[in-house]
Amino acid sequence: MKSTNLFTLLLFVLVLSSCKKDQLDPSGANCDAMEVSNQSTHVLIEQTGTWCPTCGGEKDEIQEAIDHHERVQHMAVHGGDDPFANDRTQDFRSAIIRSPYFPTVMGSTDPSFMDFLLAEAPDMQVKLDVKRDGSILKITAKIEILGEYECARENGCGVFIDGQQVNVFDFKSINLGIYLLEDGLDYPQANYGPLTHNDVMRDYLTEVVTGDQITDFGEEVSLGDTFCKYYEYDLTANNYHENIANCKIMAIIVEGNKCETTDTEWYLHFLGSDVFEVGNL
């Protein structure tokens, strides 16, 4: 009888422990308890270089946009002969920013248009939680569907054959990009002078630079659906940054599009985003 009771007690403890483990992701954050904002964010992706003679003025315009609204978020991707460029930023530029011209900003900096976008309720949004264990960052990202999201639409690809538009479907997927950014990087800007560079992309944490795929192309999602992804990042092994106190993690929902006539992504659209200051840990 005693052995039976002991077995029952051990079984209860094991079941209780497994339940707690399921509720807690590796970062120590309870994904179910993470509250995703129902407000839109506006993402500005800047292609830039310290050597670029016209990029200083573009940075002023971007800073005005950031100052205009607290929900404008920015990532600067440096390229060329630049102290803040590396193989990881080149991956990003090659995959996402196809224009060879400088400066290039993906996303509007017009105040009135930003106000219009930010007043709209988002179809989805992402929330970050970051813990630090020594040199390891443990990151939880939660995406929640907040509105009616269409995974396919007719005529979205705009394919023409013999001058006539073909009725094809544009299938969408939801991707999640996680990036390491750094503030407070001092370096002169060409034709501008001394400048402190902020929101500088240093590395990406996902397997794919354009973001890990959360849903398949055309996979239907419903209001209230949530998706959680977990990442670990070793600050010692990945020493792209200069000062971890000035670093932050940025999560971006990247919408991928694909025509039914091709197997490759042909368009990427930046949706919701969230930023977590690593220096606060």
Where are these regions (language model features)?
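Sec-dependent signal peptide hydrophobic core
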Residues: 5-11
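Local sequence-structure signature of Cys/Sec-based thiol-disulfide redox active-site neighborhoods
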Residues: 30-73
